[in-house]
């Protein structure tokens, strides 16, 4: 579903709770982007993989699933591309 910006802006002006929720969501997205930039620029390969698995664990736990046992549905290549690492590095 796509909502034109003008409509969303008008509705959020009339509904303070909607505006607050939108700001919270946008803030979370910006924070996530900043964290990813830091991860890719400052961490070594092992730290990148550690943070990736930790974040997955935390997100699974927040959704009511086990934070300790979960299936990685991404391939090694996908994980490597996401983290800026080679498949060989991920495999080690």
Swiss-Prot record:
[4Fe-4S] cluster binds at residue 1. Its cofactor is [4Fe-4S] cluster. One of its GO terms (cellular component) is cytoplasm. Keywords: 4Fe-4S, Activator, Cytoplasm, DNA-binding, Iron, Iron-sulfur, Metal-binding, Transcription, Transcription regulation. Residues 43-92 form the HTH crp-type domain. It is found in: Cytoplasm. SUPFAM superfamilies: Winged helix' DNA-binding domain (SSF46785). Induction: By anaerobiosis. Its main location: cytoplasm. Binds 1 [4Fe-4S] cluster per subunit. One of its GO terms (biological process) is regulation of DNA-templated transcription. It comes from the Bacteria. GO terms for molecular function: 4 iron, 4 sulfur cluster binding; DNA binding; metal ion binding. Homodimer. It is involved in the activation of genes necessary for anaerobic respiration. This is Anaerobic regulatory protein.
């Amino acid at each position: 579903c796509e909502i034109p910006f003008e409509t969303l802006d008008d509705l959020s002006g009339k509904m303070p709770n909607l505006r607050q929720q939108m700001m919270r969501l946008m803030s979370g997205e910006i924070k996530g982007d900043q964290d990813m930039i830091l991860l890719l620029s400052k961490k070594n390969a092992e730290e990148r993989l550690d943070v990736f698995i930790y974040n997955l664990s935390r997100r699974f736990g927040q959704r009511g699933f086990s934070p300790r046992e979960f299936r990685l549905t991404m391939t090694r290549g996908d994980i490597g591309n996401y983290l800026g690492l080679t498949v060989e590095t991920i495999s080690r």
